[in-house]
A protein has these predicted regions:
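Glycine-rich phosphate-binding loop of actin/hexokinase-like ATP-binding domains
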Residues: 125-227
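Short glycine-rich, Thr/Ser-proximal phosphate-binding strand/loop in the N-terminal lobe
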Residues: 1-34, 200
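Short beta-strand segments
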Residues: 63-65, 118-121, 176-183
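Glycine-rich, N-terminal phosphate-binding loop and its surrounding beta-alpha-beta segment
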Residues: 24-65
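Conserved active-site and cofactor/substrate-binding residues in soluble primary-metabolism enzymes
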Residues: 35-39, 78, 82, 99-103, ...
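A mobile "lid/hinge" subdomain adjacent to the ATP/sugar-phosphate binding pocket shared
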Residues: 227-259
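Short beta-strand-loop/turn "lid" adjacent to the catalytic site in phosphate-handling enzymes
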Residues: 48-97, 118, 125-133
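Non-transmembrane, aqueous-exposed alpha-helical and coiled segments at domain scale
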Residues: 56, 112-114, 185
Length: 259
């Protein structure tokens, strides 16, 4: 039974707010500056305590949507030190969100130290892809020794959409799922399993996104480094944080603002 649902949005940019729906007739909205994800989690907890629950003792577990599980995880897991170590290792491949996921775990550990925490990885759903879908056409050693491959992301979203669509249509065959937001991806799903997806080794690949470039000629970063005297870290920051809609519009990441 769903007691409440909601979101914290536009974190780190103007117009941030926290909203929560207790039922269809009641929606609470709080406009508040959310400078980072830790502040957002605190506001969510405050809103829950002011509404559907009266004490933190009512919270049995907290689920975390994690970004990258590498090849370690193909399902949700209870968080322990081993899981955290592997998540930190895989999280290094997520320049935009890697640390943010861990901030959430740290915040809950501090605020609710006795509550069980569970990690659900965005990449887990795509572990069903076959080699012809996840291998890149580069020397095979790059995968076998360094695990460079297509991982895919937004798996929790694509999995949920596929399951709900199958229920609604009474059909579990082939679907194309589109996740469209600040980050965006498309996934081909067959019989409830991911068979191909637009994101790749990192969430930078695929479609144009809020601040990410999406697919570009792979020589472009090398050309920029050679001709503009930029380091690899500087080019990475540009492609992850200064490109996409932000780069094309010189400053806007939200399509609602661009429209």
């Amino acid at each position: 039974q769903v007691v409440a649902k909601g979101m914290a949005e536009r974190i780190g940019i103007s117009g941030s707010r926290v909203s929560m729906s207790v039922d269809e007739n009641e929606k609470l909205v709080k406009d508040v500056e959310l400078h980072n994800h830790i502040e957002a989690i605190k506001e969510v907890l405050n809103m829950l305590l002011a509404g559907p629950i009266k004490s933190v003792e009512e919270i049995d577990a907290v689920g975390h949507r994690m970004g990258h599980g590498g090849e370690y995880f193909d399902k949700s897991v209870v968080i322990d030190e081993d899981v955290l170590a592997k998540a930190r290792e895989a999280g290094d491949l997520l320049p935009l969100h890697g640390a943010a996921f861990l901030y959430g775990i740290d915040a809950i550990t501090e605020l609710l130290p006795k509550v069980k925490q569970v990690a659900t990885f965005d990449s887990s759903f795509h572990q069903s892809m076959k080699k012809e879908a996840f291998l890149y056409a580069i020397p095979l050693d790059q995968y076998e020794k360094h695990k460079i491959r297509r991982y895919g992301f937004h798996g929790t979203s694509h999995k949920y959409v596929a399951e709900e669509a199958a229920k609604m249509l009474g059909y579990k065959g082939k679907f194309i799922s589109c996740h469209l937001g600040g980050g965006a991806s498309v996934t081909a799903i067959e019989n409830g399993r991911s068979v191909d997806t637009s994101m790749g080794f990192t969430p930078m690949a695929g479609m144009i996104m809020g601040t990410r470039c999406g697919d570009i000629d792979p020589y472009i970063p090398l050309h920029i480094m050679k001709t503009q005297n930029m380091t690899a870290d500087e080019v990475n920051a540009m492609l992850n944080k200064e490109s996409g809609w932000y780069g094309l519009t010189r400053g806007y990441t939200d399509l609602r603002d661009i429209e």
